A protein has these predicted regions:
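The feature captures the beta-strand-to-loop junction immediately N-terminal to the Walker
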Residues: 41-43
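ABC ATPase nucleotide-binding domain helices that frame the ATP-binding cleft
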Residues: 49-52, 148
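Helix-to-loop junction immediately C-terminal to a conserved catalytic motif
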Residues: 56
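Conserved coupling/switch loops of ABC nucleotide-binding domains, chiefly the family-specific signature
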Residues: 62-65, 115
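Conserved ABC transporter NBD signature motif
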Residues: 64-72
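ABC ATPase nucleotide-binding domains
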Residues: 81-82, 92-192
Length: 192
């Protein structure tokens, strides 16, 4: 009885997406409880990235509903969904320092310089990269770049964090360390 009344934080209902003749997703249905960490499993080309991009608002489904915190978000732009997204290739700006990469979303949101400085310093400490604020991505290891990508996604305080194979380009030892670190951060911050 209690489970039936439980409201999912994220729900996908009958999501369909095609690219020409290719069906990237077909009647996808699932829900995610608030504060939970889940993974989408499937072979290459099965539509996992497409689903994440639709939840984020970077692509629109052909049909179906995406519901976040009780609201249908199909027509809400990505910038208004309150979602952090970490891409497989990090997507860091190579000509921006660690500080500026992390601050990017906050500047877009037009936060005050004081707030940006405090928030970025807090995140740099959280990811364990104190003293590296002025380095560029090319001066960092793969694991450090990935932590900067996580910090950038977390900077605007998203309620939902989407990760698209964030550990694929990292060696096995660092991958395991980052997985443990990320799980701990997500629990600490209460992000879904």
């Amino acid at each position: 009885e209690e489970r039936r009344n439980y409201k999912m934080y994220v729900e996908l209902k009958n999501i369909n997406k095609t690219y020409g003749d290719y069906k990237a997703s077909s009647d996808v249905n699932f829900g995610i409880e608030k504060g939970k960490l889940i993974g989408l499993l499937g072979p290459s080309g099965s539509g996992k990235t497409t689903i994440l991009r639709m939840i984020a608002g970077l692509e629109n489904p052909d049909s179906g509903e995406i519901i976040i915190d009780g609201e249908v978000v199909n027509n809400i732009p990505a910038s208004k969904r309150g979602i952090g997204f970490v891409f497989q290739n990090y997507a860091l700006f190579r000509y921006m320092t660690v500080f500026d990469n992390i601050a990017f979303g906050l500047k877009i949101q037009k936060k005050s310089k004081k707030y940006i400085k405090e928030r970025v310093k807090e995140l740099i400490k959280l990811i364990g990269l104190e003293g590296l604020d002025n380095r560029y991505p090319s001066q960092l290891s793969g694991g450090q770049r990935q932590r900067v990508a996580f910090a950038r996604a977390l900077a605007p305080n998203p309620h939902l964090l989407l990760l698209d194979e964030p550990f694929a380009a990292i060696d096995a030892k660092v991958r395991q360390e980052l997985r443990s670190w990320l799980k701990e951060m997500i629990q600490k911050l209460g992000v879904t």
